[in-house]
A protein has these predicted regions:
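Residues lining hydrophobic/aromatic ligand-binding pockets adjacent to catalytic sites
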Residues: 1-136
Length: 136
């Protein structure tokens, strides 16, 4: 819900509240990630996720950093602000393994599906093994 004193237009757009749903019928705004703890206080309510944000170590370009990731149910609050979400983790691993068994990505997408509303929209990034092959 927009904060008291927000300037809403007729579609409910409130940029000061980071609400970008309904800007225009031909425009959908979203991001390429959704569980970013840096958005606490803007997209996500701080109190809702207190004590529920684990940390994990990531390595990029030889440098290690700590990342905090919100729980997957935060996607419900994400879609209060945006209409579309690009899922980029599908780039790194297929949905099924070589034996046809569901991978972790498959199970994670199934969980996202349980949490989506009727007007929420996902875009899946094509796996690199399919699309980003190196030419020899």
């Amino acid at each position: 819900m927009p904060e008291e004193g927000s300037m809403l237009d007729r579609n409910g757009f409130a940029p000061e509240d980071f609400r970008f749903r309904g800007l225009h019928p031909g425009l959908s705004v979203g991001t390429a990630s959704d569980r970013y703890a840096g958005w606490l206080g803007q997209i996500y309510s701080r109190d809702r996720y207190a004590g529920r944000i684990p940390s994990r170590q990531n390595k990029v370009g030889g440098r290690t950093f700590t990342e905090r990731v919100l729980p997957i149910d935060s996607v419900r609050e994400y879609f209060e602000h945006f209409e579309v979400l690009e899922i980029d983790f599908t780039f790194y691993r297929l949905l099924l393994d070589e034996d046809g068994n569901p991978t972790q990505n498959h199970h994670l997408l199934a969980r996202y599906r349980e949490l989506l509303g009727e007007s929420d929209f996902l875009i899946l990034k094509v796996p690199q093994v399919v699309f980003a092959r190196k030419l020899q």
